[in-house]
């Protein structure tokens, strides 16, 4: 189902050029690649009675327990939407209700949904750029190719930058400084290097104009979710009163993942570089699942452990979220309203716990 709304027109937001197809494709490829790398960061968790969401290119995706909606503002000022029912992975496969496995299932579904939302927004931005020069079929095929190419490239980049490089440098440092050459020392250096690379990556991309706009939509998503959770009428004016950093943001989750990884890697009985590298890849689902359980456990103790686990993520969200404009907040509200309408149409009930 798709809908349109024209309000709060903005100046054109696409910074691509039309100087040639190769230039456009390369810029678009790099833009998609960066967005895919950011998917876990831009994701906000959804619980049984709450809503969650994610920023996409020039828009926001909002989801409720059984539905989701992507809203994107085109350069003309129109808001285009796509809303669909959403079945939880744990409802179809009960095994994903078990501890640890439920965290893996939740992240996999969130990434899959994030890719669909990103695909939708990328298609509409491509239409803005191409106009009527290409058929819809051609645009879809180009977008699908670019998306899948970016998924593969992003996965390889993730493994290389956050698994291979930190371990390689930590092993080299351990040979250079014998005191850091123990298993514990190498794992500590490995974790610190990984954290520095992550923070450096965030800082560098935050300087990009396109990504800064995504961070503004990320802030809009958080403000609107806060507005909804407060019980106040969800309006642009009410949403703008809230802060942009939210405790359920994927930024907080990723930091917990990094700390959990350091603890689990320290238990590995391997000494060879190859064995440690393979184990780091193989243990990714375990690390994700354990991190999810820690966040879930801490969420029930909001004044104690939850505050400790989420505070670094809240600080980091000063980078990954930025104050949105009223027009950007309106897009987030539009996505939320459509997701809620579909949720209620399916017999669901949205209440605040």
Predicted regions and their residues:
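Polar-ligand-bearing catalytic/cofactor-coordination segments
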Residues: 41-52, 56, 60-62, 130-133, ...
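Hydrophobic alpha-helical membrane-embedded segments
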Residues: 67, 98-117, 190-214, 288-300
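Juxtamembrane "helix exit" motif at the C-terminal ends of alpha-helical transmembrane segments
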Residues: 120-121, 154-179, 257-279, 288, ...
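Divalent-cation
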Residues: 19-133
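Hydrophobic alpha-helical segments characteristic of transmembrane helices
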Residues: 128-177, 182-208
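Hydrophobic alpha-helical transmembrane segments
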Residues: 152, 188, 192, 255, ...
